[in-house]
Amino acid sequence: MSVHFSSRTDQWATPRALVAALERELGPFGLDVCAEASNAVCGRWYGVAEDGLAQRWEAACCWMNPPYGRGIGRWVAKAAASVRDGDCQRVVCLLPARTDTRWWQVVRTEAALVRFLPGRVKFGEGRGSAPFPSAVVVFDRTAWPSLTPVGWRP
């Protein structure tokens, strides 16, 4: 198993403070594309049974905190395609900052904005920090400033 995928779980519940800060800046999320009832960030969400990868992401602004295992590349590709194909205006993602991976090249070439978060994110109830750095990645059809803020704090 790769060191990049050495965590005991690939499910990391979204920190509520981060969601609140992002919604203040970007507007409310209309669809959480990969959630569970216990961690969905909005009223509409796709869980395992609905398989978000098989659905159209139809909302002005979607939220994505995908499973962080080996399948993460499919989620990143789906986020980029959903914006590119016009299914949604924007997909905001919380991702591990794994800039050396193949899937990160989709982020590099198609994301409108990348914000590397300082320190380690405290997921779920915040009992412990993630064993990896994180970034907020925004795929969006609108123009954004060309400079990417680094070290943004919610």
Q: Predicted regions span which residues?
A:
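Class I S-adenosyl-L-methionine-dependent methyltransferase catalytic core
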Residues: 1-154
